[in-house]
Amino acid sequence: MIRTNFFLKQARRHEVKAKSSKKHRSDDTVDRDHSDKIRDRLNSSENGDEKHRRKEKRSSRGKSYSRSRSRERRHRSRSHDRRKSRSRSREKKRRPRSRSRSRSKHRHRSKSRSKSREKKKRIEKPRRHSRSRSQTPPSPPAFRGRNAAMDAQEALARRLERAKKLQEQREKESAEKQQEIAAVAAAGGGSVINVAALLASGTQVTPQIAMAAQMAALQAKALAQTGISVPSYYNPAAVNPMKFAEQEKKRKMLWQGKKEGDKSQSAEIWEKLNFGNKDQNVKFRKLMGIKHEEEAGTSSVDAESFKTLKQQEEMFRNMDAQYEMARSQTHTQRGMGLGFTSSMRGMDAV
């Protein structure tokens, strides 16, 4: 009986202690959950990169749990018996469940919070964008109806076209007036009379008109003197009519055919030139292009031309004699040296 009572008392004590340890454990888990919630709130209130901070939370949670476990183990190993060590093993089995539950809860909460934050940020982004747009200058309104700038450009283009047309008309009128003035000047005698006629008619005399009248008067004068008029395709202000008439005369003289009776005195002298040798005379006439070989007498030639012919014959004879002497001394007498001593003396004597 005594033994049974003793065992019953011990069993009751053990149950009481187990209940107290369970209560202590439940209080510890509640405190941990509460501390984790506070930490989550503090961490969620901070701005920044959420993913990086979640990783830090997980690592910090693991560390805190391990620290709390080590403290509890030390405390219990010092103060409790082996029976309590059994309860420790039970706690070890139960703790991962509670930890996983608490973690899952916290994760779920953190995910929901992060989603709500992301939604808030997404909602806030267009607002910020709208603020930046309001700060920038407003875009120009869409084109509706007429644009003032385009109308002004079109009006300017029309004015330019009108001005061009007016200028072309004025140029045509001035060209026609100049042609009329030139025709009047060619028909009339002098420039003064034409200018006076223009003044009388009421037309305004410009420097260009006066210049055209002067040129027309010069053309009329050249036509009267030479009989050659300046063609219409030449600019009368750029061509001198007198010089043009002289050039035309030269062209006619150059390209017209030669007449048989027209022979100059120099041509007759060259034809009757005599070198003293018949073969040389024939060669010379061929070179000069003299076709006929008529030997004219002294009666047909003038006294002056006869004298010139005689002088030419003497000159050619002397040249032949000198050539023969030089040839004989340079080519045949090479034994006398280089030809600068005795041969040169012989040349001096000659």
Swiss-Prot record:
One protein family per Pfam: SMAP
Annotated Basic residues bias: 10-24, 52-132
Domain of life: Eukaryota
Ranges in a coiled coil: 146-187
Region (Disordered): 1-146, 328-350
Record keywords, A-Z: Coiled coil
Feature: compositional bias, Basic and acidic residues: 25-51
InterPro entries reported for this sequence: SMAP_dom
Family: Belongs to the RSRC2 family.
The protein's name in its UniProt record: Arginine/serine-rich coiled-coil protein 2
Source species: Xenopus laevis
Protein's gene: rsrc2
